[in-house]
Swiss-Prot record:
Keyword Magnesium among UniProt keywords: yes
Annotated localization: Cytoplasm
Natural source organism: Cereibacter sphaeroides (strain ATCC 17023 / DSM 158 / JCM 6121 / CCUG 31486 / LMG 2827 / NBRC 12203 / NCIMB 8253 / ATH 2.4.1.)
Binding site for Mg(2+) 1: D252, E268
Residue ranges of every copy of the ATP-grasp domain listed in the record: 108-301
Catalytic activity: 2 D-alanine + ATP = D-alanyl-D-alanine + ADP + phosphate + H(+)
Family: Belongs to the D-alanine--D-alanine ligase family.
Keywords (A to Z) from UniProt: ATP-binding, Cell shape, Cell wall biogenesis/degradation, Cytoplasm, Ligase, Magnesium, Manganese, Metal-binding, Nucleotide-binding, Peptidoglycan synthesis
Protein name in UniProt: D-alanine--D-alanine ligase
Gene3D superfamilies cross-referenced by the UniProt entry: 3.40.50.20, ATP-grasp fold, A domain, ATP-grasp fold, B domain
Source taxonomy: Bacteria, Pseudomonadati, Pseudomonadota, Alphaproteobacteria, Rhodobacterales
GO CC term, one of those recorded: cytoplasm
UniProt keyword Nucleotide-binding, yes or no: yes
């Protein structure tokens, strides 16, 4: 039953922070979403997720949880399982889709089985990557279960040897063939594709380019041939469905213009996209006529268990 505000879930707990390498990004998303939801008429409690999260949520007993967590434990199925156990409706994808999307290697297997275009990749340990070229250069090395381009290395064709990785790299690394071309991203909202964004940055679209002011420019909608735009929409929607995503997802692609349609490659799908007003998915929602409070409210009203 709708509350006095006319909302199905008038009392919302916004989960943010957590203990992953993306904590600061999550806090930024969480504070932005909290302010937007208050503007939309919700009663909001901000929750910095910690070891006592189950107790905190049980005491708060919110009508729904807005998940603004990023990275490990927040978007890999862990907190989703806790919310299912507590039977609190929550936003974004459920346990299985979240776990699959966070595991890049398994997500790629799902994409390949669905006939989506992916590039060659293998799993390796840091020791193996440091010892020899796992793939012919150029290739990319990145953690198999991290987001926000944390810990990404590019090995160029003229590299003298394998990369000297940081000592704190996780044991599961994905090594994949480097895909040249334009950086594109597409948000799916429910069963609707919002838009394609062309991301312009100086060099690799890394953590700094994503979050440092002026680190990149976003062109919405991307200036693309109609058949490429249509193909981007199709790939993003099929990826969303193949993983079983709910709420919103954002799929990242590369397009090598010289190869036409054959140059369009799906890199990964993110079940917990950044959620500040200037993040990629909210920008696309704004292009489609949704204010940031309306976009956040849509996510809350879409919340459920058994996702």
């Amino acid at each position: 039953m709708a509350g006095q505000s006319g909302r199905t879930f008038p009392r919302v707990a916004v989960l943010m922070g957590g203990a992953s390498t993306e904590r600061e990004v999550s806090l930024s998303s969480g504070h932005s979403c909290s302010a937007a939801l208050r503007d939309a008429g919700y009663e909001v409690t901000e929750v910095d997720a910690g070891p006592d999260l189950a107790r905190v949520l049980a005491e708060l007993s919110p009508d729904a949880v807005f998940n603004a967590l990023h990275g490990r434990w927040g978007e890999d199925g862990c907190v989703q399982g806790l919310l299912e156990w507590l039977r609190i409706p929550y936003t974004h994808s459920g346990v299985l889709a979240s776990a699959l999307a966070m595991d890049k290697a398994r997500a790629k297997e799902v994409f390949a089985a669905a006939g989506l275009p992916v590039t060659q990749s293998v799993l390796a340990t840091p020791e193996e990557v440091r010892a020899r070229h796992i793939l012919p250069p150029p290739y990319v090395v990145k953690p198999n279960a991290e987001g926000s381009s944390v810990g990404v290395y590019i090995v160029h064709e003229d590299a003298n040897g394998p990369p000297q990785l940081a000592a704190d790299m996780p044991q599961d690394l994905m090594v994949e063939t480097y895909v040249p071309g334009r950086e594109l991203t597409v948000t799916v909202m429910g069963d609707r594709v919002l838009a394609v964004t062309d991301i312009l940055s100086d060099g690799w679209y890394d953590y700094d380019a994503k979050y440092r002011p002026g680190g990149s420019r976003h062109i919405v909608p991307a200036d693309l041939p109609a058949e490429i735009t249509e193909a981007c929409h199709d790939i993003a929607l099929r990826a969303h469905r193949a993983l079983g995503c709910r709420g919103i997802s954002r799929s990242d692609l590369r397009w090598d213009e010289a190869r036409g349609l054959a140059g369009l490659i799906l890199l990964e799908t993110n079940t917990q996209p950044g959620m500040t007003p200037t993040s990629l998915s909210p920008e696309q929602a704004a292009h489609c006529g949704y204010s940031f409070p309306e976009f956040c409210a849509w996510l809350v009203e879409d919340a459920s268990c058994s996702r």
